[in-house]
Amino acid sequence: MEKIKLNLLNAIDSSEILNYKDQVKEINEKMNRFEMIGSDFLGWKDLPNQINWDEFLNMEEKAKWLIKENVEILVVIGIGGSYLGARAAIEFVNGTFPLSGSKKLEIIYAGTNLSSTATAQLLAYVENKKFAINIISKSGTTLEPSIAFRFFRELLEKKVGKAESRKFIIATTDANKGLLREIVRKEGYTSFIIPDDVGGRYSVLTPVGLFPMLCAGLNVREILVGAQKSNDFYKKSDLEENIAYQYAVARHIMHTQKKYAVEVLISYEPYFQYFLEWWKQLFGETEGKNELGLYPSSKIFSTDLHSLGQFIQEGSRILFETVINLKKPKIDLDISEDKENFDGINYLVNKTLHGINVAALDATVSAHTDVAKVPNIILEIADSTEETLGWLFMFFERACAMSAYLLNLNPFNQPGVEVYKANMFKILGKPKK
């Protein structure tokens, strides 16, 4: 059963979408033949059906070993696509405050910034706990993870000794080349491989994302099942049957014809926050080139309705919204009756908190579309299980690649980020090769 439903009624007419039927078919068939620009990095689209099960079993065994050794915390060190997918998945499935009791590690994230305070506080947090490190970098030269790895490696070596520390350091990197691979060879760390044909922001279903998920207790096999089913749906060339590509075309029309500059992805569940962050990187780096692309923004409602709801309702007409409508929450709560009704909310008795959240969603969509005339794309998802997560990952990755190809862009490069890096390294005095 399909886990995602797309509703474009409050955004765009279906006839406008189908005008792109032939173009989408041509692009998709060229993708399948690896004839599109950037085809060297199309490996992600077949990942769900080409899992390296030997490596997967090794990851499972390493995660079980860490738990058996009473490791309390896994420090995931990476930035951008090297950590966002894992964090998105772990919080999507476990929630922001996961219930205790199952055999899993606490996951914390380092190397995501250059803040001395944040890094010092993380080091202090793990200092008196048993921790392991998963350093994730294809090249091993990205500055933020490199600095964090030095700090955490030194702390781990100080706690257990250099020889023993090697057992608790896991590297996820290139199979053959790069500085981190050289370090792995020298130190003998356990390592898992980032495929050559998968870029960072598309790497969530490689060991980049899968190993931290396993350590966090997720049923990763179910994520892969969902991704496989999703891929079977969304690799089709027929636009009438492929809602991932319908979403891509809707975004394209909003940007190029209706001249919107911003897409806001909205969830009414706070634990979707890092899924939204993953989405922002995916679309921001994929589309933001040649002075093109929608600016990807995200909001958690109803929280952000109390800060930005006014702007969306009556401010500049620069944005449209894509709303994730979760049908079944992890946990629901009933509103109980209070005989004194001192808080004045007895009218909510016999309603559930999720039902009230859905009412807020429906009311907001109506206010934004009927009154403010802000287009709303609705993505209805069945639940927040592992299988549904797998569906979502492939839905958005397929849609994102198609969005870029419709703009005649290479979806898999990001040359613009090299500018600030070059400036920073010049200021810091990095030696030239």
UniProtKB/Swiss-Prot annotation:
| Reactions this protein catalyses | alpha-D-glucose 6-phosphate = beta-D-fructose 6-phosphate
The family database entries (Pfam families) matched by this protein are listed as: PGI
Single Gene Ontology BP term? Answer: glucose 6-phosphate metabolic process
Pathway(s) per entry: Carbohydrate biosynthesis; gluconeogenesis; Carbohydrate degradation; glycolysis; D-glyceraldehyde 3-phosphate and glycerone phosphate from D-glucose: step 2/4
InterPro entries of this UniProt entry? G6P_Isomerase, Phosphoglucose_isomerase_CS, SIS_dom_sf, SIS_PGI_1, SIS_PGI_2
Q: Kindly identify the residues recorded as the active site.
A: 285, 306, 421
* Subcellular location(s) per record: Cytoplasm
Of the GO CC terms on this record, one is:
cytosol
Kindly state which keywords UniProt assigns to this record, in alphabetical order.
Cytoplasm, Gluconeogenesis, Glycolysis, Isomerase
A Gene Ontology molecular function term of the record? glucose-6-phosphate isomerase activity
Any idea of its EC number? 5.3.1.9
UniProt similarity note: Belongs to the GPI family.
Record's function text: Catalyzes the reversible isomerization of glucose-6-phosphate to fructose-6-phosphate.
Q: What is this protein called?
A: Glucose-6-phosphate isomerase
Q: Which organism is it from?
A: Mycoplasma mobile (strain ATCC 43663 / 163K / NCTC 11711) (Mesomycoplasma mobile)
